[in-house]
Amino acid sequence: MSIDRKTHILLVDDDEIDVMNVRRAFEKGKIENPLFHAEDGLEALEMLRDGSIPKERRLVLLDLNMPRMNGIEFLKELRDDPALHGTAVVVLTTSDEERDRLEAYHFHVAGYLVKPVRFLSFVELMTTLNRYWTLMEMA
């Protein structure tokens, strides 16, 4: 019996190009973690609650600007749910606004990353995040 030591990553982002860039960055950075995708906060909560994503070793990469339920609304709902409140979340957004950062950290996010414009910078960002999360899981 083998033990799955990979972190299951849920990308919550409505922008098709950003989703494609994350997938490409995973491939280019040789990141083998399972990647799930939700279009918005409502879909993400449904996936987390219905078992679509294993409960152990999961990380949410969260955009802030989305329809139906934005990232901050998602964080509030997530932290209010006893079954989900401990889920690790890293904000991955184009917003460099201090107000957005403060509001996200108010909901105990593990990090706040601004999406780089250049693809190679994006690959480096995803690879670094993967290394960091792997080290944190080993601790």
Per-region residue spans from a language model:
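Conserved active-site segment of CheY-like receiver
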Residues: 14, 91-96, 116
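Non-catalytic signal-transmission and effector/linker regions of two-component phosphorelay proteins
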Residues: 1-10, 16-34, 49, 53-56, ...
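Conserved Asp/Asn-Gly motif in the active-site loop of CheY-like receiver
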Residues: 38-42
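Short, glycine/charged-rich "phosphate-handling" switch motifs in NTP-dependent
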Residues: 110
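Receiver (REC) domain active-site loop signature in two-component systems and cognate sites
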Residues: 66
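Conserved phosphotransfer cores of two-component systems
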Residues: 51-55, 79-86, 107
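Active-site residues of response regulator receiver
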Residues: 62-63, 93
